[in-house]
Amino acid sequence: MNKSIRLRLIVMNIIQWAAWGAYLTSMGSYLASVGLGARIGIFYAMQGIVSIFMPTLMGIVADKFIPAQKLLGICHGISGVAMTAAAFYGMTAGTDVAFAPLFAMYALSVAFYMPTIALSNSVAYRILENNGFDTVKVFPPIRVFGTVGFICAMLFVNFMKDGAGVQFQNSYNQFFTSGVISLAMLVYCFTLPACPCTATSGENESLAERFGLKAFSLFKDKNMAIFFIFSMLLGVALQITNGFANPYISHFKVVDEFATSWGAENANALISISQVSETLGILLIPIAMKLFGIKRVMLIAMFAWVLRFGLFGAGNPGPGVWMLIISMIVYGVAFDFFNISGSLYVNMRTSGKIQNSAQGLFMLMTNGIGATIGTLSAQAVVNKFTHTVDTAAGNFLVGDWNTVWYIFAGYALVVAVLFMILFKEPKNMNEKIA
């Protein structure tokens, strides 16, 4: 039974993250190729905007009204249909893609995909706890397979080509891939073990309790408030490389020295090293949490972001490719030691009644407010130092990319130093705040 439960959750994580991996790191190149390079940040910011309210809202629904595993499937179904519609529009529009219709369908898709990140974590935690597992020890190895799914989807769209020889990573076909995977998740979720709504309604409940807003009471605890604020500040960094790493590496195609390099031609495959590193990073989390505690683990993540951005600025697909590779390797620690450890920390500090809502709140601060500010600010920086060049090979963003990445590295360094000074680690990690 124990092996069966783990296997079910492994499959869930593979599908969950493959749906995102199909386009997350390559969408920027497609947008640039159809003349929407100056609006890449808006597309990625939309993921943050919907994360401001949708994860919290869906967390409340899962706590109060619809079992979490069924709600997870419903969200994937809506997301998959909308993403498939976006792909169909891209196919019919060709090179005459208009911003409004593509963005509208994409926005609807991510509005229902983003809450599934927190929901899938909640479903896994609940099923593991119901079967007597220690989530801190058992969940990270399961979550590793989510990254495996993400990598497989990335590599699929990198190497798969359409009839005209265009890689999926540079076309609307990445959206088709994501849509089909999400629809598969819809079916799979309805076969998962039940995760009943845990919150009870009663006449004595306050309005905040009835609508699941009690998770915001976590801000009454000074340390948790600081934790959530810095989650937002570090969340600024999360989507920057997702949105701009592929256009950055691909732009070397129009730089004579690097035009024929393997990295410039296969940006998504090069970036996939980041996800391989993420897989290994997840396995280190239980050990790191035990040895260092949440503060040091998050500090490691913050300084890893400094290296991630700084090495991007110094590297290239030629003699400097080793710096790009190290940057990809560092990403595993930068992402996992913040996202996964932070989610586990929230789970340990909250009771079952509001855990879904608390995970939604964490998602709001990181992938919501933080990522929105980050992607819009990053787009402004990119627009300041780069410009679009139309070539026979397509549209590319060229300019002073080095300065762009050094600015991002400087920001991450400031956040790390402030967190080191202000955050105090709790003496009892398992003491419930709410």
Residue ranges and their predicted role:
Residues 42-63, 269-284:
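Central cavity-lining transmembrane alpha-helices of secondary-active solute carriers
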Residues 159-180, 380-412:
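A membrane-interface helix-boundary motif in multi-pass transporters
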Residues 14, 76-83, 95-119, 123, ...:
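Hydrophobic core of transmembrane alpha-helices in multi-pass small-molecule transporters
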Residues 77-96, 303-317:
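C-terminal ends and interior cores of transmembrane alpha-helices
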Residues 1-52, 223-259, 266-267, 339:
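Helix-loop boundary and gating motifs at the non-cytosolic
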Residues 57, 85-91, 181-194, 368, ...:
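Multi-pass alpha-helical transporter architecture, strongest
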Residues 1-3, 193-229, 254-259:
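Juxtamembrane intracellular "pre-TM" segments in multi-pass secondary transporters
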Residues 296-342:
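C-terminal transmembrane helical hairpin of 12-TM major facilitator-type secondary transporters
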